Amino acid sequence: MSSQVVGIEPLYIKAEPASPDSPKGSSETETEPPVALAPGPAPTRCLPGHKEEEDGEGAGPGEQGGGKLVLSSLPKRLCLVCGDVASGYHYGVASCEACKAFFKRTIQGSIEYSCPASNECEITKRRRKACQACRFTKCLRVGMLKEGVRLDRVRGGRQKYKRRPEVDPLPFPGSFPAGPLAVAGGPRKTAPVNALVSHLLVVEPEKLYAMPDPAGPDGHLPAVATLCDLFDREIVVTISWAKSIPGFSSLSLSDQMSVLQSVWMEVLVLGVAQRSLPLQDELAFAEDLVLDEEGARAAGLGELGAVLLQLVRRLQALRLEREEYVLLKALALANSDSVHIEDAEAVEQLREALHEALLEYEAGRAGPGGGAERRRAGRLLLTLPLLRQTAGKVLAHFYGVKLEGKVPMHKLFLEMLEAMMD
């Protein structure tokens, strides 16, 4: 794998915050030009009944269930707030200049709005100025990030902010004091969870929605395009999540890039497996995209359904808990085998801290006894080779899709694919 990917700049990793819909993982400011939209045919989003208006304002799907994902031959995206043509990715979301400016004014002015109706006003290109309260709510719902707006109004600088203000920074390296936290799932006693685990639980990304088009054309290409769009957004979220892990941001930029380029698919695949744990022989690629093995094959994924379900069943047999999942996910990140890492000692230090946190959690879960926590931790760690093998098969499949050239892919997803297969 090459240590450099054409087109990936420090902005992908260093700029904050990230959003599910931004291929850069960064917020735009008034001193930065809009991010160039991916060339070629790209998935666009619209609402049923959407009409283009001469005012530059329309309808967008930000909410679950209301949006439709359709393929278009037009090389452009729509604003997720109002449906107008998006000028770029602003504050983490594909949006038009008008909604970008509205969101910025609202945050900088600390403006509070009140809906004159029932807080359910339709936000379209023509009606977006009718209710500012519902428009602002829509901005937040589709993922616009308040932290991306500079409050000081000073041009040329970058505001300092915390991604999650409720989370105190954790020391790294250092001790992570234990504290009680109720463990979900079963009438088991409370397990002590150290501060690192608590931090990982808090910074765990919110749910993503694929927004597939139920009325779309038959065939597997639209489904594969939906997954490519979903993966592109998940990469952005993964970059933001990785930066929230104590010790990762202290790595050099090149090492951050090398680590992420080598394990991003493992993180995504583990997320699919975790969402699928409550299901029976089904895969939850997103909250609104669940496929069984036959459905995955019909969607153009070949035998990936069976491959992914093998991993899911392994984790189901372990009765993987959420605390264990967030630790395993962080360990998968730190378990990078990239030969381009410059400071291997720093990455090893991160890996050791996460391993110790896993042992501490399992010790509290098992209670006093003869090494049960180490056996449990060992069984969890033994899933990492299967995870890597599974991710490799998923990568190979989508790289083949890329070579066929029939499915539109966004720039970041393409670059990360090429970095892995180079």
From Swiss-Prot:
Residues 1-67 are annotated as: Disordered. It is found in: Nucleus; Cytoplasm. Residues 58-67 have a biased composition (Gly residues). The modification N6-acetyllysine is found at K129, K138, K160, K162. Coiled coil: none annotated. Pfam families: Hormone_recep (PF00104), zf-C4 (PF00105). InterPro entries: Est_rcpt/est-rel_rcp, NHR-like_dom_sf, Nucl_hrmn_rcpt_lig-bd, Nuclear_hormone_rcpt_NR3, Nuclear_hrmn_rcpt, Oest-rel_rcp, Znf_hrmn_rcpt, Znf_NHR/GATA. There is a cross-link at K189, K402 (Glycyl lysine isopeptide (Lys-Gly) (interchain with G-Cter in SUMO2)). Keywords: Acetylation, Cytoplasm, DNA-binding, Isopeptide bond, Metal-binding, Nucleus, Phosphoprotein, Receptor, Transcription, Transcription regulation, Ubl conjugation, Zinc, Zinc-finger. Residues 76-151 bind DNA. Phosphorylation on Ser-19 enhances sumoylation on Lys-14 increasing repression of transcriptional activity. SUPFAM superfamilies: Glucocorticoid receptor-like (DNA-binding domain) (SSF57716), Nuclear receptor ligand-binding domain (SSF48508). A zinc finger (NR C4-type) spans 79-99, 115-134. Gene3D superfamilies: Erythroid Transcription Factor GATA-1, subunit A, Retinoid X Receptor. Its main location: nucleus. Binds DNA as a monomer or a homodimer. Interacts (via the AF2 domain) with coactivator PPARGC1A (via the L3 motif); the interaction greatly enhances transcriptional activity of genes involved in energy metabolism. Interacts with PIAS4; the interaction enhances sumoylation. Interacts with MAPK15; promotes re-localization of ESRRA to the cytoplasm through a XPO1-dependent mechanism then inhibits ESRRA transcriptional activity. Binds to an ERR-alpha response element (ERRE) containing a single consensus half-site, 5'-TNAAGGTCA-3'. Can bind to the medium-chain acyl coenzyme A dehydrogenase (MCAD) response element NRRE-1 and may act as an important regulator of MCAD promoter. May function as a modulator of the estrogen signaling pathway in the uterus. Induces the expression of PERM1 in the skeletal muscle. This is Steroid hormone receptor ERR1. It comes from Canis lupus familiaris (Dog). The gene is ESRRA.
